[in-house]
Amino acid sequence: KFEPTRPMQGIGAHMIGIVTAQELRENLGDVFVSGRTCTEWIDFSISAIERLFLKPELEALLEVVGPNGELIDHHDGRTLNPGHAIECAWFIMHEGVRRKDSRLVSLGLTILDWMWERGWDEE
């Protein structure tokens, strides 16, 4: 849902979508939920994260973006949450290991490396 004042979307629904679908698939099989299999929901969410929230030019996974993945010039749009991003990276890596998909593992590792660096306090 977007509000007309400051249209934006958060990464949370996609990352929770991944882990929820992983758990459903693990316990119930690759069942259909709202017209998609669990694996299709995982693919949908990983694709959205990669397309909208991953910003290689910033070496960051953003918490909030505009409706089409654009940067938001407001404090909401500049929020980084390394812990959240690292959790997201774990879900993507877990899926990559399950599928033996080195591209997904690499994507997760890239997110982990970028956000670990951003979140680490040298002091």
Question: Residues of each region from the PLM?
Answer:
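Glycan-recognition and catalytic cores of secretory/periplasmic carbohydrate-active enzymes
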Residues: 1-123
